[in-house]
Amino acid sequence: MSDVDQGQTPSAVAPAPSNLADAYRAAFRAHPAGVAVITADGSDGPRGLTASSVASVALDPPVLVFSLSTNSGSAAAILGAPVFVVHLMHSGGVQLARRFASTGAPTIDEPGVWATLPTGDWYLPAAASVLRCRPLSTTPIESSTVVVAEVLDIVLGTDRGDPLVYHHREFHSLSERSRLT
C-alpha cells in the first residue's frame, strides 16, 4: 500500500505549478503512454502522425479511441479518410515514431518503410501491431479532435522489441526488467 492509500502525505510530491494549463501539462508529462503511429491515404500519398492517446474502448466489436491536434498537418487526411491505420509501436520502431512526430515523415518512395495491406491501404510493417480502422465518431474539442473507431482488421507483427512508451517528453522502452513483482 502506498503512503497516499494509508492517508499519509506522499513523500515526493512536488508543488503544482500555479497555472492550471502548466500543471495539466506537467501531470501528463509524468504519465507514461504507449506510442502509436496513425496513418491514412492522403491526396499526395500516405500521411501520418505519432500519438500517445490511443486506448482500447470495447472488444465486441473492437473499438478504440484517440485524440489528435487539428494543428497537425496530417490531421485533415486522417479525419477525412474512410479508413485509417493505427500502428502500435515497439522499441524497434522508435525512429519511425520520431519521424512521424515531426514534419519529416517518410515518403512513399522510401524503400522498406511502407507496404500495402490486402485492402490496398498503406501500412508500416515495422509496427508491433497494425489495426485497420473506420471512424465511428469524431468530436472536436478546442484545438483537438477525439476519434472513436471500429477496428476492421489486425495484423500482428513479429516481435522486434519491447513496447515503446512516451514519458517526460522522451521515448522509452518498456522491458521485461521493468516488471514489478
Feature map (PLM): residue ranges:
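Basic, polyanion-binding surface patches
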Residues: 2-181
